[in-house]
Amino acid sequence: MSAGPAKNPSVVTRFAPSPTGFLHIGGARTALFNWLFARHNGGQFQLRIEDTDRVRSTKEAIDAIIDGMRWLGLDWDGDITYQFERAPRHTEVAEELLKAGKAYKCFATAEELEAMRAEQRAKKQPQRYDGRWRDRDPSEAPAGAPYVVRLKAEQEGETTLHDLVQGDVTVKNAELDDMILLRSDGTPTYMLAVVVDDHDMGVNHVIRGDDHLNNTFRQLGIIRAMNWDAPQYAHIPLIHGADGAKLSKRHGALGVEAYRDDFGYLPEAICNYLLRLGWGHGDDEIITREQAIEWFDLTSVGRSPSRFDFKKLENINGHYIREADDQRLTDLVKPRVEKTLEQGLSSTEQALLLQAMPFLKPRAKNLNELAENSLFLFEKRPLKLEEKAAKQLENTSGSLLAILRKTLGDLPAWDSESLEKALHDVAEQADLKMGKVAQPLRAALTGRTVSPGIFDVMILLGQDESLARLDDQLSLSPTHS
């Protein structure tokens, strides 16, 4: 294993989702990058729930985010920070800035601000607050008039951000207006809360999507006004769909619970795939968690958006299914099988599923396929045939099935060697290639055209069940007398 980049144990990162929805796949990648950077350095990874939007934030979404993080194996250090609970501290910082003359009260009414924006639109000017209360005395406002608190942003010069992914990015300070810190009802804004929380939590590396890049320059204004040390920033490109458009639900911008529950992916496959979306280590596609922790750094994160590719995710998931422990897969597949069968599996059937797992998993790319491919073991006779399997049997003479039934029925031993010899004998007797014998037999025994190897199928079903299923098809075959 190649040596990873140098380590810095003082690193503190954070993942700060808003609980207005589930943990979507883009957020999961952001969490993963923060977690890996902290774990690589032997530092701290913290979780903050940004629940200041009291209308849209829900307990269900908070629970889903925490559940998603745990499922992905992204453990955090210390207690979860809930942003809403820290509102008094955010207000305290705004009051400090007011006292220091680095923030001011703005009494502009909604009507005045709308007229200002309309004039800016008419003149084709950028729409931003014009600072009309920046240098006015609050005594000029009507008594008891509502106000917001705004940051007195720097107006001269420019700000350069040394971004760990994007490189140097420079913005003229005149392009940044005096943003609101406290609303007219006294509640702190998101922009203020984020800066205060990052500072108080000791966060010194902010790794987030590049859609936050513009916010960073505004947040740096608060940091400078408070004379705080700024964290290092790394703005990672967003994930796009396969067509190059911004990732949406039709591309796969869903919550991680959909990938787990609906699509049947394993968490290690999701993490491996998300890691490779925007970060690379040579030509390595399959990267274990241990390797990811050892190798991860921000210098290998690309600047271009990555494209979400379900096919690649399926292939990676197939790899992890093949590598997974049989008992673990059995436990994961069991509820899916029971849901389809609309009944629970007995202890004997569960043991059969476990016994079948080594033969089932090489052909499955997700847990749904694994469950689907195992159903033949538990379906009641006579089997419902898939359309392709029914056609296969329609095109097979009843005499071939009869020869198979007799040959298999006469076998004294029911093992791979005996079964293989028996099928070869039937193929020779009927002057057919092995596949022409195995395919209709598979259809008769499983009701499908895809299954584990035919000898594995017969051993799993056992002699009695295999012969009974053949008898069912023989009784339906018009060419069998």
Swiss-Prot record:
CDD domains: GluRS_core (cd00808). Its EC number is 6.1.1.17. GO terms for cellular component: cytosol. Keywords: Aminoacyl-tRNA synthetase, ATP-binding, Cytoplasm, Ligase, Nucleotide-binding, Protein biosynthesis. A motif ('HIGH' region) lies at residues 17-27. A motif ('KMSKS' region) lies at residues 246-250. InterPro entries: aa-tRNA-synth_I_cd-bd, aa-tRNA-synth_I_codon-bd_sub2, aa-tRNA-synth_I_CS, aa_tRNA-synth_I_cd-bd_sf, Glu-tRNA-ligase_bac/mito, Glu/Gln-tRNA-synth, Glu/Gln-tRNA-synth_Ib_cat-dom, GluQ/Sye. Residues 118-139 have a biased composition (Basic and acidic residues). It is found in: Cytoplasm. It is an enzyme of class 6 (ligase). ATP binds at K249. It catalyses: tRNA(Glu) + L-glutamate + ATP = L-glutamyl-tRNA(Glu) + AMP + diphosphate. GO terms for biological process: glutamyl-tRNA aminoacylation. Its main location: cytoplasm. GO terms for molecular function: ATP binding; glutamate-tRNA ligase activity; tRNA binding; zinc ion binding. It comes from the Bacteria. Residues 118-143 are annotated as: Disordered. It holds the Pfam family tRNA-synt_1c. PROSITE patterns: AA_TRNA_LIGASE_I. Catalyzes the attachment of glutamate to tRNA(Glu) in a two-step reaction: glutamate is first activated by ATP to form Glu-AMP and then transferred to the acceptor end of tRNA(Glu). HAMAP family: Glu_tRNA_synth_type1. Monomer. Belongs to the class-I aminoacyl-tRNA synthetase family. Glutamate--tRNA ligase type 1 subfamily. This is Glutamate--tRNA ligase 2.
